Swiss-Prot record:
Keywords: Cell cycle, Growth arrest, Pheromone response, Phosphoprotein. Interacts with STE11 through the respective SAM domains. The modification Phosphoserine is found at S202, S248. Gene3D superfamilies: Phosphatidylinositol 3-kinase Catalytic Subunit, Chain A, domain 1, Transcription Factor, Ets-1. Residues 233-327 form the Ras-associating domain. The modification Phosphothreonine is found at T244. The keyword Endoplasmic reticulum does not apply. This is Protein STE50. Involved in growth arrest during conjugation. May interact with the G protein alpha subunit. CDD domains: RA_STE50 (cd01786), SAM_Ste50_fungal (cd09536). InterPro entries: RA_dom (IPR000159), SAM/pointed_sf (IPR013761), SAM_Ste50 (IPR015316), Ubiquitin-like_domsf (IPR029071). It comes from Saccharomyces cerevisiae (strain ATCC 204508 / S288c).
Length: 346
């Protein structure tokens, strides 16, 4: 018996069944496909309680039966290996089937463990992505709220019946003293119709200011007033237009759209064309920008829209006027001053 145990130890390898301290074989059924012939014989000696000299062990060695061939053995093969002993063959076949089923269960368990690991990794990745998307959404929402808050807080408010320029998100209206109204956008637009006071917002309209060369007395009454810019029809112009040709004081005039790159000369010509003024007389007119209580003549090569935006950002509430050149000298004479600022002080 000791010689048999010694033979078992010598024929074992890394994938073979192990022996405990009592000499009992510890089966590694999941590795039986890697067993050698000696490993198979060792397993048969342990499970069937046979000697190494048993015909089964001899037939296994003669036929070179290794571990991966065991599941292929049928009952008849087992009976031939057992030298016609049916009882031993049945027992041998049952042990082979149990070992095969054990390996399949082990594979299923390993597959399930792998699937669980993959699902956990997928869950972790998905959770991280969702958290990242949530953070991005929160930042985007805060940015949008800040923009809306800034936009709403920077909008001018009309209080106590005082008419102010109310820019919309698309058009910035630039009033004109001769009834010309310019708006800061990319293209020239058509007529904007006035809306009723019941509307919450309406296009800003400008009314004609009389030429200063018509009457000195008229200037004395209104020299400290600027053209009224009304956001609805309930606020008419504060300047009378008696004896002034053109539209009536309460008539909404046309509005122009201009881009940032348009020069003063181009805007001036388009304004005159839009309001049916003679094109050949365009040098008799000038564009004047008013901000605070100051007025300044715009040179032909300047960019009125850019200047308008810069002054607006400084909170000076600018407005651009279309005037005749002769009006400025008359204003200086009536004021009795050497101030050559076009249009004088508002």
């Amino acid at each position: 018996m000791e010689d048999g145990k010694q033979a078992i130890n010598e024929g074992s390898n890394d994938a073979s069944p192990d022996l405990d301290v009592n000499g009992t074989i510890l089966m590694n059924n999941e590795d039986f496909s890697q067993w050698s012939v000696d490993d198979v014989i060792t397993w048969c000696i342990s499970t069937l309680e046979v000697e190494e000299t048993d015909p089964l062990c001899q037939r296994l060695r003669e036929n070179d039966i290794v571990g991966d061939l065991l599941p292929e053995l049928c009952l008849q093969d087992c009976q031939d290996l057992c030298d016609g002993d049916l009882n031993k063959a049945i027992k041998f076949k049952i042990l082979i089937n149990k070992m095969r089923d054990s390996k399949l269960e082990w594979k299923d368990d390993k597959t399930q463990e792998d699937m669980i690991t993959v699902l956990k990794n997928l869950y972790t990745t998905t959770s991280a992505k969702l958290q990242e998307f949530q953070s991005q959404y929160t930042r985007l929402r805060m940015d949008v709220l800040d923009v809306m808050k800034t936009s709403s807080s920077s909008s001018p408010i009309n209080t106590h019946g005082v008419s102010t320029t109310v820019p919309s998100s698309n058009n910035t209206i630039i009033p004109s003293s001769d009834g010309v109204s310019l708006s800061q956008t990319d293209y020239f637009d058509t007529v904007h119709n006035r809306q009723s006071p019941s509307r919450r917002e309406s296009p800003v309209t400008v009314f004609r200011q009389p030429s200063l060369s018509h009457s000195k007395s008229l200037h004395k009454d209104s020299k400290n007033k600027v053209p009224q810019i009304s956001t609805n029809q309930s606020h008419p112009s504060a300047v009378s237009t008696a004896n002034t040709p053109g539209p009536s004081p309460n008539e909404a005039l046309k509005q122009l759209r201009a881009s940032k790159e348009d020069s003063c000369e181009r805007i001036l010509k388009n304004a005159m064309k839009r309001h049916n003024l003679a094109d050949q007389d365009w040098r008799q007119y000038v564009l004047v920008i008013c901000y605070g209580d100051q007025e300044r003549l715009l040179e032909l090569n300047e960019k009125p829209v850019i200047i308008f935006k810069n002054l607006k950002q400084q909170g000076l509430h600018p407005a651009i006027m279309l005037r005749r050149r002769g009006d400025f000298e008359e204003v200086a004479m009536m004021n009795g001053s050497d101030n050559v600022t076009p249009g004088g002080r508002l």
